[in-house]
């Protein structure tokens, strides 16, 4: 069976629409992670700026990131079980998020290494997330997310040229807003609008 160009274009558009709908349904997770990262960054900045137990300023990250991981992990496990039951395929783009997340987890070992350079941790954490966001935004053709992803890449690379000092955790919060919060809100509002239409 041969497909006509119009049929193949329609098929491609349907696949993109289905993936976009999946991200709209999961817009909550983008918002959820952005809030966790923003809270962690703000807590660390306040503790460093006020000199309130600065040695333990990592505590927000140490509590909120594992909490977010377990909540996401178990909800994705339930979703995977439901997809297997309904014989749906999993989105291969989810593996990109997983790989970026594993890179972020590995960066928590940097303070215990000989580098002790938090700018390297910023690059290890946010460059993969920025490029994954950009790849998915380009794939889904979401122009706002493309712009915020490019801004995230530029800001992440800026740690090589500017010394942020104790404001580095605030940069994490800004990057979380650009990479996760802005597209998450856009996806979530689109999803709510579609549910009200149906």
Predicted stretch roles:
Residues 1-26:
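N-terminal juxtamembrane cytosolic/stromal segments of multi-pass membrane proteins
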Residues 20-30, 51-55, 116-123, 142, ...:
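Membrane-water interface of alpha-helical transmembrane segments
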Residues 132-198:
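Terminal transmembrane helical module of multi-pass membrane proteins
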Residues 21-109:
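Selected alpha-helical membrane-embedding segments in polytopic membrane proteins
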Residues 36-43, 67, 106, 129-132, ...:
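Membrane-embedded alpha-helical transmembrane segments of multi-pass integral membrane proteins
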Residues 57-67, 113-127, 174:
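Structural signature of hydrophobic alpha-helical transmembrane segments
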Residues 91-149:
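Membrane-proximal helix-loop-helix units in multi-pass membrane proteins
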Residues 71-88, 131-138, 182-188:
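C-terminal ends of transmembrane helices
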């Amino acid at each position: 069976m041969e497909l006509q160009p119009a049929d193949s274009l329609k098929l491609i558009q349907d696949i993109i629409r289905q993936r976009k709908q999946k991200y709209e349904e999961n817009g909550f997770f983008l918002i959820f992670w952005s809030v966790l990262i923003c809270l962690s960054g703000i807590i660390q900045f306040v503790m460093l700026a006020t000199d309130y137990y600065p040695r333990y300023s990592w505590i927000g990250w140490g509590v909120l990131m594992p909490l977010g991981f377990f909540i996401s992990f178990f909800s994705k496990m339930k979703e995977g079980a439901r997809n297997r039951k309904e014989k749906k395929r999993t989105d291969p783009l989810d593996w990109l998020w997983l790989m970026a997340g594993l890179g972020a987890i590995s960066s928590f070992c940097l303070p215990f290494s000989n580098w002790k350079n938090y700018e390297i941790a910023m690059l290890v954490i946010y460059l993969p997330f920025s490029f994954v966001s950009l790849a998915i935004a380009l794939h889904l053709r979401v122009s706002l997310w493309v712009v915020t992803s490019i801004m995230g890449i530029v800001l992440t690379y800026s740690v090589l040229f500017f010394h942020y000092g104790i404001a580095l955790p605030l940069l994490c919060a800004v990057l979380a807003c650009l990479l996760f919060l802005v597209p998450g809100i856009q996806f979530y509002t689109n999803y709510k609008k579609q549910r009200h239409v149906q």
